[in-house]
Amino acid sequence: MKEFFYLQGVDDMDEMKDLGKYEPGAIEEKWYNFWEEHGVFHDEPEEGKEPYSIVLPPPNVTGQLHMGHALDNTLQDILIRYKRMQGYNVLWLPGKDHAGIATQVKVEKQIAEEGLTKYDLGREKFLERVWEWKEKYGNTIGKQIRRLGSSCDWSRERFTMDDVCARAVREVFVSLYEKGLIYQGFRITNWCPRCQTALSDIEVEHENDMGHLWYFDYPLADEEGAVRIATTRPETIPGDTAVAVNPKDERYAHLVGKRVKLPTTDREIPIIADEYVDMEYGTGCVKITPAHDPNDFAMGERHHLETIVIMNKDGTMNEKAGRYNGMDRYECRKEIIKDLTDMGLFVKSEEKEHAVGHCSRCHTVVEPLTTKQWFVKMKPLAGPAMEAVQSGKTKFVPERFSSTYIQWLENIHDWCISRQLWWGHRIPVWYCDDCGEVIASRTDLEACPKCGSKHIRQDPDVLDTWFSSALWPFSTMGWPDRTPVLNQWYPTSTMVTGYDIIFFWVARMMFMSMEFMKEIPFRYVFIHGLVRDSQGRKMSKSLGNGIDPLEVIEKYGADALRFTLVTGNTPGNDMRCYYERVEGNRNFANKLWNASKFTLMNLDDYDPRFIPEESQYTLADKWILEGLAQTEEHVSENLDKYELGAAADSIYDFAWNSFCDWYIETAKGRLYGAHNADRQVTQYVLVYVLTRIMALLHPFMPFITEHLWQHLPHSGETLARAPWPAADERLRFPEEQEQMERIMDAIKAVRNMRAEANVAPNKMCHIRIAVHRDDLKKCIETHEEYFEKLGHVEKIVLLAADGTKPENALAAVVTGMEVYLELKGLIDTAKERERIEKAKAALEKEIARTSGKLNNKGFLAKAPEDVVAKEKEKLAEFEEKMKSFDERLRFLADL
């Protein structure tokens, strides 16, 4: 064994062992400042050193840390700290998103308090106010991410609208425009009448609202009769350009090709057949309004229908709506229903719950609206992005999400990239009023390059926020320049993100990177799920079940929150977070604190130069060293597979159960005994194992591990840069581990039987063990002291495996042996009988109460299924417990 530990500040041993009480708040700020001041998170590009890089998904500049951020950041930080300790050349590049509509709405609300609108200020003055707001409030989320312990290289922080990113955005836009992949066109988009801008799908929140399904008759144009349609949106009737039925619907086959008179207008519209129509919905006959419904728009394209826009951008009706011109859309709805009723065309209405889209920023009901927008042609870009995943260049973890990704790209539509906002990357296109030239330019223009006219104006729209985000893996590293950072760390190693933005962000980064870098943006896409509450419900304001991560950090510490977010977590699946779990992990941190305190209190005479010979290790020493080596292997293997939850569970089990609960108890006798050599060996093992636990746990719980490691004997300036612990093959003891495990099984059996018999904790007992293996028999004979210290066993009698079993004893079967606890003289049988009889009487009342409930027909009829199931489960448990009481009483009668 050639590993040495150097006691930092050995003259201050008293100060080092005086850890005091564990107070997370007292240590977290201290160590984060230490890491930043010492440049721990910063690496320079180093040729010949293996790179590892992650770009932080940029939170909105308006953002407050929520549980989704906390999970996302924790998973990334674990990977980054792990690779940093493994000696990789690491970059974790942070940044913030300008969050177009979210930020603009914030500032609009701010100036509204002054009685102003953005139009009162004008574009330039309004943007000045937005930049002021960004400078004042935009760093909040960064400070909160720091509180979580995220070890980002803040010296390289980027902003989606800084000069570096802005240059990349212009280069990409103009390049795509020059290739014919960006165009202007009239298409249907999500439209917010209040914000007066197109919205991406992710900016639309769907809520189930109770509305109505109205039934109307549309008269046939050339004969008697009518077709009956059902709609949730009567206000769009003036924009109808067809009525559609399913071609398989025999009820309407004879009507296909005929025409109907469109109520409220003087137009006639055709009856068409399209497979999209659901024969079971309403009457199976639907009105088609291509300008105001995305499915109708697609049908309109298939059948070459006219697109008639009947609404203004503020949600009022326009002149194409006839007499309803100028009305609000909902006022128009009422008027149309009234008018069709007067015409005798209203049939009936039914209450119907349906999903209604709302603007995520102002909560206005979104209007599907056909407007002139800028689009990216997606089909040519989708191919290379699909091939990158199909060929395995980029892998999804879990792999099942690759099919989700491919399926979306196979059915991709052109991407609407323009937004009618002021805050954002302004579209770099200019129009010449004199010659009509349309120019896309990488730099601002002052004159038309074709005719020289100065009568030019820039397109007023800005780009979708996701446009700049799609360039994030390479724009943040200085592209289009080939910077040293880009050369070293692109492509990035891993993208960590939720499954909810695979389409909005992951796919877009893929196709932009394949187009402009001719290379994948990341090698792995590590997908995580959502954070849910204790009942598995999504956290939301309406349910009031959200947990504020900053409140959790204040109360329990960042380490406890981080460990909660990762333990039990599996890739791609949702996880549950609630205060009881966080408190449990705060207790784990406290357990480590106390174990370190115990170790430090016994290091007064510690010699860092002492290295034990193998013969000096006890069975318990060898057991814990082998357990450590196995844990080191399991943790590394699981981290490499992105099974971060399994890695955390492995450390938890070893640190709490093996080291704290078992090994420290075996160590006490040797530390306090008369033999100095025993004390030295035990000190060595305690320090060796504990410091390596700190290293293994550091990526998960960075603050407490750094603090404790700094107090323990160590070498190096910071645990964050200490070598990652790899299993030492010179300290492998699998045989001894198996022997100690069998002894522990026997001791656990003794403890369980003592508890079952209600034996006083300090009372020594006698046991008999029937052993089935000679090596185990010898092992028990030479290690009886473990039974004495850990099981309060005064005497052990070893029996032949086929010998007579003792009477009046409790028995337990464990691997390779049977263990018997002799009860005679160990317990007061009369008192024990009285205790069980009392417990039995109380249990009989519970059984009667629960049985009464389950025999009550009213309860069974009214109670929810899960409540009834719980009562049945409870009754089964009670009855099982009653059986065990009866068995115990029979046993006591024989003593």
Go through each PLM region and give its residues.
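Secondary-structure transition/capping motifs at alpha-helix termini
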Residues: R81-N89, Q110-R123, K143, R147-C152, ...
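Extended active-site and interfacial segments that coordinate phosphate-rich ligands
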Residues: A70-I78, V227-P263, V286-D293, H303-V309, ...
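Alpha-helical support elements that line or immediately flank enzyme active sites
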Residues: H69-L71, P294-M299, A507-M517, I651
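Feature 926 captures the class I aminoacyl-tRNA synthetase adenylation module centered on the KMSKS loop
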Residues: E3-L7, Y215, Q407-F467, L471, ...
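Non-catalytic terminal extensions that flank enzyme cores
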Residues: K2-M67, V90, V347, S360, ...
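N-terminal catalytic cores of NTP/NDP-binding nucleotidyl/phosphoryl-transfer enzymes
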Residues: P45-V107, V169, I229-T231, T236, ...
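Residue patterns forming the tRNA-binding/recognition surfaces of aminoacyl-tRNA synthetases
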Residues: G9, M16, K21, K30, ...
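Conserved phosphate/anionic-ligand binding catalytic regions in large, soluble enzymes, centered on
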Residues: A70, V227-V245, C359-R361, E367, ...
